[in-house]
């Protein structure tokens, strides 16, 4: 059995995806960007964008009964790899001692040219998908 959540953004129906899917003992969170209330926020600020992305990940997890403490894997897709320390510091601050496995991948662009980062996550929480 799977459970799914949507944020009702304009992108979800166009691309045909869910914000997060709980399956078995795992929650898979789609890439989150620096949006709040459907609007882009924190233009030019790599750290603040990273924090907002992770806030959006946390909100999706919470809707399925999980939290950032359950995250075992993240991927950060960034448009300017030279700012890796800014992204990394914000990621480290958000996850603290959880310290999930992570990758930071440089990409040419994201869906909005103002977006510097997109974060996806996988959480492990026994029974979450039941």
Where are the regions a protein language model picked out?
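N-terminal presequence-like segments and the immediate start of the first folded domain
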Residues: 1-55, 59-72, 78-130
